[in-house]
């Protein structure tokens, strides 16, 4: 698209924004508030305000966040593409350069770029990098393709990459010395390049989130403090790769996976908070397989202070042919510092022969202070479990029950009374029950939708 068309497009947007905004009524507003208004406008409309007056041009130059998406050039209100592909992409690149030139880039904290034209990115990012990375304090790059030059920045603190993109080779000169937060949304790395090259080039990285359709072979980092791993590949594969978590300093772990017959290798010495969201695999006929092995993972979870097992994790532990339902007592035995226990789906949890109720084995030496029950339905089985837990937890101070579905106040009050009437080993819980009674919304036993 030539410059005349580009200028015409900008003018049209400026007129449109002027029509939509009552400028006279906004003149009395302070600059800080107007900058916030610009922040919530789509980038194309926000930058068009710079054509309205010198004040608006100055105001837009104060915006700290920049979101660029070529969708606004491909799709128009009339429902069809106005220009040919090359013209559209060229127009988008020119728009990017003009926007960054207007902003100056020195004060930008968050930059977001979305585009399908992967092969053009190196040229574009190279042309804007003097602005983009100068005095940049915080950055979030989200796009369907990304230039390799994004891997070299001395200012980048937060980076988000996605989605469904293959990354065959990470540049050997990759260097992100101050990167602290990294999100990888369906990024495929070959071999162990994720850990050997990418993570190795991020010495300050503390928070890593990975969403993946296949298992990465290795996640290794000595400086990570928080790790979230979600594996969405659910089909049964005996020869599946063995996941290795070599993250000895992680204190907060979220792990969602379809465990295989071969257990993952883990090095997790510092865990304090763990949430396990485990699911059963399916074979080629979509039949559930229940021979998952999570012993290595469980054996590495020691001395945690907060343990959360989701409903699906509870179900997997129940159904496993390897009798993995015993891992919960094992976890509790290995966690003398456990203070918070979160359980879901108690209505399906641990039965003995002929459906005889079997309570969860709780070590007598436990120091659990808070118990959270999620997806509570008010069944007799759940009440038995809660009663069993209350009798086994002498240090308990707080019980939270999260309802599976919304309920009216009358039903909620009935469920509250059912729990309040249960005996408890903790003197603090008993004292609170006596003081408040069953009809109160108890401070120590609370029901939440």
UniProtKB/Swiss-Prot annotation:
Organism: Arabidopsis thaliana (Mouse-ear cress)
Entry protein name: Putative F-box/LRR-repeat protein At3g44090
Highest taxon of the lineage: Eukaryota
Keyword GTP-binding on entry: no
Domain F-box: 23-77
LRR repeat segments: 133-163, 186-212, 214-231, 247-278, 286-311, 320-345
Keywords: Leucine-rich repeat, Repeat
SUPFAM superfamilies from the UniProt entry: F-box domain, RNI-like
């Amino acid at each position: 698209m030539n410059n005349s068309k580009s200028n015409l497009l900008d003018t049209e947007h400026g007129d449109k924004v002027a029509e939509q905004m009552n400028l006279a009524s906004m003149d009395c507003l302070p600059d800080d508030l107007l900058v916030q208004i610009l922040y919530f406008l789509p980038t194309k409309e926000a930058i068009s305000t710079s054509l309205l007056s010198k004040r608006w041009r100055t105001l837009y130059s104060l915006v700290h966040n920049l979101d660029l998406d070529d969708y606004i050039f491909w799709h128009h209100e009339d429902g069809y593409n106005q220009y040919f592909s090359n013209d559209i992409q060229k127009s988008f690149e020119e728009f990017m350069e003009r926007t960054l030139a207007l902003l100056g880039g020195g004060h930008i904290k968050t930059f977001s770029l979305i585009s399908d034209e992967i092969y053009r990115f190196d040229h574009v990012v190279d042309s804007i990098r003097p602005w983009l990375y100068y005095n940049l304090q915080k950055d979030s790059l989200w796009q369907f393709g990304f230039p390799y030059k994004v891997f070299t920045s001395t200012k980048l603190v937060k980076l988000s990459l996605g989605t469904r993109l293959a990354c065959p080779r990470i540049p050997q000169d990759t260097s992100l010395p101050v990167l602290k937060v990294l999100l990888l949304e369906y990024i495929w790395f070959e071999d162990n390049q994720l850990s050997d090259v990418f993570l190795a080039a991020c010495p300050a990285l503390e928070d890593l989130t990975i969403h993946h359709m296949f298992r990465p072979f290795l996640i290794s980092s000595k400086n990570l403090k928080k790790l979230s791993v979600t594996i969405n590949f659910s089909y049964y594969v005996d020869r599946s790769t063995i996941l290795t978590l070599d993250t000895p300093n992680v204190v907060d772990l979220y792990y969602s996976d379809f465990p295989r017959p071969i257990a993952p290798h883990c090095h997790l010495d510092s865990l304090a908070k763990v949430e396990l969201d485990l699911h059963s695999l399916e074979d080629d006929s979509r039949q559930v397989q229940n021979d998952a092995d999570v012993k290595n993972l469980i054996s590495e979870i020691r001395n945690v202070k907060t343990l959360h097992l989701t409903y699906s994790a509870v179900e997997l532990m129940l159904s496993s042919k390897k009798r993995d339902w015993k891992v919960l007592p094992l976890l509790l035995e290995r966690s003398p510092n456990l203070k918070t226990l979160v359980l879901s789906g108690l209505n399906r949890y641990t039965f003995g022969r002929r459906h005889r109720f079997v309570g969860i084995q709780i070590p007598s030496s436990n120091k659990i202070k808070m118990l959270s029950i999620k997806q509570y339905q008010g069944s007799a089985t759940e009440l038995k479990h809660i009663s069993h837990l209350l009798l086994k937890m002498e240090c308990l101070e707080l019980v939270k029950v999260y309802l599976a579905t919304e309920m009216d106040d009358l039903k909620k009050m009935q469920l509250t009374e059912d729990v309040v009437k249960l005996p408890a080993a903790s003197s603090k819980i008993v004292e609170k029950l006596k003081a408040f009674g069953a009809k109160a919304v108890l401070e120590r036993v609370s029901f939440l939708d």
